[in-house]
């Protein structure tokens, strides 16, 4: 979903950047507050940022949509550090990719953050916690977080392209066309990301349950480690 420089009209670039900015400001405030409470937190957020950067650096071109498909990693990030911090790590990952890898653009950064960091993160976070409250185990909830986060990201990207490029035509028709262009690549990638997210959480639960407990993802019984 890395929209290239010049894909969107400048007016829509300004709109998406204005939309993303308050989320980034809130995330920075929350990071400062959380770091004061727990010195472990900021380095862990940095680790997650590196993971999101690496995961989202595996593009599959989608020429008919003017962008590319790839796993995002924001579903897993949102489960571990919350959706607000995921917005921040997404900004860092996307900015580095745009500046040094020509992957995405600077004017389209707000649109990319809105899709991957906002829509993807919050959708995955709420899907995970809704599944857990409904009685789903960690694997199932993690799978749903990964899948819904990934697909929400690309649905929002399709919306951004439809709004920016439909011109006098139908936004709905443009959205449908772009969304369908993503299906051959993003349907399997979304399922793969669900498995990856579930597997990562299961691995942490088996090897480092203290991390999940510290991040309030799961609660250990008193005396457990």
Curated annotation (Swiss-Prot):
Keyword Transport listed: yes
Pathway: Cofactor biosynthesis; adenosylcobalamin biosynthesis
GO molecular function: cobalt ion transmembrane transporter activity
Job of this protein: Part of the energy-coupling factor (ECF) transporter complex CbiMNOQ involved in cobalt import.
Cellular localization per UniProt: Cell inner membrane
Listed name of the protein: Cobalt transport protein CbiM
GO BP field: cobalamin biosynthetic process
A Pfam family: CbiM
GO cellular component: ATP-binding cassette (ABC) transporter complex
Keywords of the record: Cell inner membrane, Cell membrane, Cobalamin biosynthesis, Cobalt, Cobalt transport, Ion transport, Membrane, Transmembrane, Transmembrane helix, Transport
Gene3D superfamilies assigned: 1.10.1760.20
Membrane topology: Multi-pass membrane protein
Keyword rRNA-binding: no
Assembly behavior: Forms an energy-coupling factor (ECF) transporter complex composed of an ATP-binding protein (A component, CbiO), a transmembrane protein (T component, CbiQ) and 2 possible substrate-capture proteins (S components, CbiM and CbiN) of unknown stoichimetry.
InterPro entries: CbiM, CbiM/NikMN
Organism per entry: Sorangium cellulosum (strain So ce56)
Family of this protein: Belongs to the CbiM family.
Transmembrane segments: 7-27, 43-63, 76-96, 108-128, 143-163, 175-195
């Amino acid at each position: 979903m890395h929209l290239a420089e010049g894909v969107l009209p400048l007016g829509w670039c300004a709109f998406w950047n204005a939309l993303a900015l308050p989320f980034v400001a809130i995330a920075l405030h929350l990071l400062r507050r959380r770091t004061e409470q727990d010195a472990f937190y900021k380095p862990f957020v940095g680790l997650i940022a590196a993971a999101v950067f690496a995961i989202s650096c595996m593009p599959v071109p989608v020429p008919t949509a003017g962008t590319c498909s790839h796993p995002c990693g924001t579903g897993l990030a949102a489960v571990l550090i919350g959706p607000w911090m995921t917005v921040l790590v997404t900004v860092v990952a996307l900015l580095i990719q745009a500046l040094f890898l020509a992957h995405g653009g600077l004017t389209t950064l707000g649109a990319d953050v809105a899709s991957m960091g906002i829509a993807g993160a919050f959708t995955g976070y709420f899907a995970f916690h809704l599944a857990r409250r409904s009685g789903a185990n960690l694997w199932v909830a993690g799978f749903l977080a990964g899948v819904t986060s990934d697909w929400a990201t690309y649905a929002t990207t399709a919306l951004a392209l439809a709004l920016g490029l439909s011109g006098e035509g139908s936004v709905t028709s443009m959205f449908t066309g772009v969304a369908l262009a993503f299906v051959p690549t993003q349907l399997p990638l979304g399922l793969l990301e669900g498995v990856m997210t579930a597997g990562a959480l299961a691995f942490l639960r088996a090897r480092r349950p203290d991390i999940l407990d510290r991040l309030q993802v799961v609660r250990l019984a008193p005396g457990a480690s």
